[in-house]
Amino acid sequence: MAKEKFDRSKTHANIGTIGHVDHGKTTLTAAITTVLAKRSGKGQAMAYDAIDGAPEERERGITISTAHVEYETDSRHYAHVDCPGHADYVKNMITGAAQMDGGILVVSAADGPMPQTREHILLSRNVGVPYLVVFLNKCDMVDDEELLELVEMEVRDLLSEYDFPGDDVPVIQGSALKALQGEAEWEEKIIELMNAVDEYIPTPERDKDKPFMMPVEDVFSITGRGTVATGRVERGQLNVGDTVEILGINEEKKSTTVTGVEMFRKLLDYAEAGDNIGALLRGVSREEIQRGQVLAKPGTITPHTKFTAEVYVLSKDEGGRHTPFFSNYRPQFYFRTTDVTGVVHLPEGTEMVMPGDNTEMTVELIAPIAIEEGTRFSIREGGRTVGSGVVSTITE
């Protein structure tokens, strides 16, 4: 059957759920889709199992992959990512959180903030999630009003500690499970949450007037049609028929024509900043493009290997290193969707960098990545985030 056109009349925002494992992120995601579909008759109610992804990932009792769902309120259309909660899957959290104009931080009222609550707030700050709204979940399990107030204060303090406006952030108390089970008073709390999200998270200022660029998240082949690259358009606009360059990782760049654009399985004439899309590329084989590269308007961005950056090194308490590092330290640098190994050179007079410090450093990557001044990245070793930084100048 022919694909229906995507409705652009409502403003669009990308949000997601973050928080500690088992605090109820996926249940809340299911509850939002269910309550909104029930109230408006629009959108599709998603069951917990449908969001929680592939079976082998659920057997370990944790969500590994990033699930994308869509729903709408009266004023907006949302694309929602359910980010994995477990520390082993921080890598996915980083790719998921990078897709967010705002986040819903889920905290179990019964447990209060936990290590990953802190880690996800930190990650949100580092990957540039500008606004968070808090959902205190499992409030049906807490009878003590004072305890709820205490947990709320604790969450607000934690947000302030990481430069979010803890005093102003909306905090909604509710129960995702009870709402999912259709209990009216708890359904109201979901509506209250979505009203807060509508009002508190501003309509994102899109970079759609800048030149087109999209980090590649995934690549697959469609028999008879060609190769599709998926990702979130970081800036600019892409029209069917445009020429784009595939840049990064490899030394040589490749030009191609975009022969089709789709979003949520619907065809578009064009895509713009903020859209999660699949772009069909003419004459590109599956082997010629990979995650970590970018699609960009020809001549607007170049891959680089050497830059200076301002970096914050996580303290031991934040889950960072326990020991200092020195020049010639070789961690992974996580740009947009991929890790690339790089060598660190510390400025003259700085012998070593302690956990909890911030420092300037020069980085030399082993493969070129499309970066600019202001591009953010994480520093990781063995799958663990140990620092975060921003490119200050490009040297090569």
Swiss-Prot record:
Chain spans, region G2: 61-65
G1 as annotated region, ranges: 19-26
Single GO MF descriptor: translation elongation factor activity
Pfam hit, one: GTP_EFTU
Binding site for GTP: 19-26, 82-86, 137-140
tr-type G domain segment(s): 10-205
UniProt EC number: 3.6.5.3
Annotated Gene3D superfamilies: P-loop containing nucleotide triphosphate hydrolases, Translation factors
Enzyme class: hydrolase
Localization of this protein: Cytoplasm
Region annotation (G4) ranges: 137-140
GO cellular component terms listed in the entry, alphabetical order: cytosol
Catalytic activity: GTP + H2O = GDP + phosphate + H(+)
Region G5, annotated ranges: 175-177
Chain residues that bind Mg(2+): T26
Coiled-coil residues: none
Span list, region G3: 82-85
Keywords: Cytoplasm, Elongation factor, GTP-binding, Hydrolase, Magnesium, Metal-binding, Nucleotide-binding, Protein biosynthesis
Family of the protein in this entry: Belongs to the TRAFAC class translation factor GTPase superfamily. Classic translation factor GTPase family. EF-Tu/EF-1A subfamily.
Record function comment: GTP hydrolase that promotes the GTP-dependent binding of aminoacyl-tRNA to the A-site of ribosomes during protein biosynthesis.
Subunit details: Monomer.
The name this protein goes by in its record: Elongation factor Tu
Source organism of this protein record: Shouchella clausii (strain KSM-K16)
Gene from which the chain derives: tuf
